[in-house]
C-alpha cells in the first residue's frame, strides 16, 4: 500500500547529467524511469516537473550577459527537452505519459490545464509538466509548487543528490546533521536553502508538504512511497 495516492515529483535537471558535465546521461535517465515505473505500478498517480540546469539555466545566463527574460525562456525550453527524454524513457518501459507544457507548443506537448492533468493521471498516465510556470523570473521549484497545489497532490517529493535537509551543507561541513522532519517556519528561521522562498511559501500557504530525499540511489522512490524514513519531511 503506497503512503501517498497522488504525488508531484520534482527532479533536478542537473541530476540527469549523471557523471557527465552537460546534457542527459542515458543511464541516469533509465534509472529514474525504472524508479517511476515501480511506483506507478503501485497505483500511485504521478505528476513530474524536471529542471533544465543540465542544459541551460536562465539566472546563470543573465550573469553572462543574456537578457533575463530570454534566458529564462531558454531555460523553459531546456525543461521541455528533459521532459521529452523522460517521456521517451518511460514509454520504452510501457508506461503511458503525457507531456503538458505551460506555453503552447503542440505537437511537442499538450497545453497544460489542471483538469486535463488530473483526468490523465486518473486514467493511468504519468503527467510530465514542462516549461515551468510559462513566465520568466520563476524557478522550476516554484513551478513544482504551483503544479503540486493545482493537481491537489498529497505531497511534493523533491528528488535531489542529498538524502535530506541538513543544518548546513553536508558537502562543505562534516559536522552538519540531518533533520528527520522540519517545519516551514524553522526553514525560514535557519535560512536553509531547500527551495527558493517563493516556492517554499507557496507550499506553506497551501498546506503542501515536501519530502526531500536522494533520488540518485536506485530504489529510494519506492522506499519513500512505502513509508521508509530516508529523507526529510517538511510540514506546517
Language-model segments: residues:
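C-terminal catalytic "cap/lid" subdomain
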Residues: 1-236
Amino acid at each position: 500500500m503506497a503512503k501517498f495516492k497522488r504525488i508531484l515529483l520534482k527532479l533536478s535537471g542537473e541530476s540527469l547529467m549523471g557523471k557527465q558535465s552537460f546534457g542527459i546521461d542515458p543511464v541516469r535517465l533509465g534509472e529514474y524511469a525504472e524508479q517511476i515505473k515501480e511506483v506507478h505500478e503501485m497505483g500511485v498517480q504521478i505528476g513530474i516537473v524536471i529542471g533544465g540546469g543540465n542544459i541551460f539555466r536562465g539566472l546563470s545566463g543573465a550573469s553572462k550577459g543574456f537578457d533575463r527574460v530570454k534566458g529564462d525562456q531558454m531555460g523553459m525550453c531546456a525543461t521541455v527537452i528533459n521532459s521529452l527524454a523522460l517521456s521517451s524513457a518511460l514509454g520504452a518501459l510501457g508506461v503511458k505519459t503525457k507531456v503538458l507544457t505551460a506555453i503552447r507548443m503542440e505537437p511537442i506537448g499538450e497545453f497544460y490545464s489542471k483538469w486535463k492533468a488530473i483526468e490523465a493521471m486518473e486514467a493511468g498516465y504519468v503527467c510530465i509538466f514542462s516549461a515551468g510556470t510559462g513566465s520568466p523570473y520563476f524557478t522550476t521549484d516554484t513551478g513544482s509548487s504551483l503544479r503540486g497545489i493545482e493537481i491537489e497532490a498529497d505531497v511534493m517529493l523533491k528528488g535531489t543528490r542529498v538524502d535530506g535537509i541538513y543544518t548546513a551543507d553536508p558537502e562543505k561541513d562534516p559536522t552538519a546533521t540531518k533533520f528527520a522532519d522540519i517545519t516551514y517556519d524553522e526553514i525560514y528561521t535557519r535560512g536553509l536553502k531547500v527551495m527558493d522562498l517563493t516556492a517554499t511559501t507557496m507550499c506553506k500557504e497551501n498546506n503542501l508538504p515536501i519530502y526531500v530525499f536522494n533520488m540518485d540511489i536506485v530504489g529510494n522512490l519506492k522506499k519513500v512511497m512505502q513509508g521508509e524514513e530516508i529523507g526529510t519531511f517538511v510540514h506546517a
